Amino acid sequence: MLIAHALGMTTPSIRPGHPADIPAIAAIYAHAVLHGTASWELEPPGEAEMQRRFEAILAGGYPYLVAERDGDILGYAYAGAYRPRPAYRTTVENSIYLAPTAQGLGIGGLLLDALMQACAARGFRQMIAVIGDGTGASVGSRRLHERAGFRLIGVAEKVGFKHGRWLDQMLMQKELGEGDRSPPGL
C-alpha cells in the first residue's frame, strides 16, 4: 500500500516532466547533492544546467517523469544511456530523486514503476541502478530497487570520496520487456 495514501494524502500523479518543473527539480537535486550520497556531484548545478540536462535526456529519446500532488513536485525520475558505446543501446541507467518530505511514502516506487514501463515501451531491455554508498537514503534506494525486482550485480569499493569519507557504489540490474529472449530491433 502506498504510505502516502494510508496517511490520508492523495496519491500523486506521475506525468512527463515539463520545462516549468525545472526549478523544483533543481531544488530537489540540490538537496541531494549537498546532503546525501545519491549524487556524487559536490556542488549543485544551477537551473540552466538542469534545464540543459533535462533537454538532453528528452532529445535522446529517454523518459523524464515527475511525481506531482496538488501542484507540488515531490520527486522525479529519468533514464539515460548506460554507456555511450552503440552495443549498450538497449540498456538504460535510472535516476530517482525525491524531496526530503516525500521520502519513505512510496512515491519512489510509483516513479520507478512508471519509469520501467516507459523504458520497456521504448524497447529498452535492461535497466541499471547505480546506487551510492549503502547508508542513509542509499539504503532506501537499494530497498526500493529490490522491491521492484532488481538484483545486486556488483559493488565497487571505496571509489568515491564525499562528505569526508570513502564511498562504495552498488550496481543493480533488472530486465525489461523481452530482456535477452530476442535480439533488439535494429
Language model segments and positions:
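Acetyl-CoA-dependent GNAT
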Residues: 16, 44-101, 112-113, 118, ...
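Conserved GNAT-fold acetyl-CoA-binding loop/helix
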Residues: 26-53
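Conserved catalytic-core motifs of GNAT/GCN5-like acyltransferases
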Residues: 78, 130-132, 142, 146-167
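A short, internal acetyl-CoA/4′-phosphopantetheine-binding micro-motif in the GNAT/acyltransferase core
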Residues: 95-104, 131-135
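Conserved GNAT acetyl-CoA-binding A-motif
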Residues: 119-133
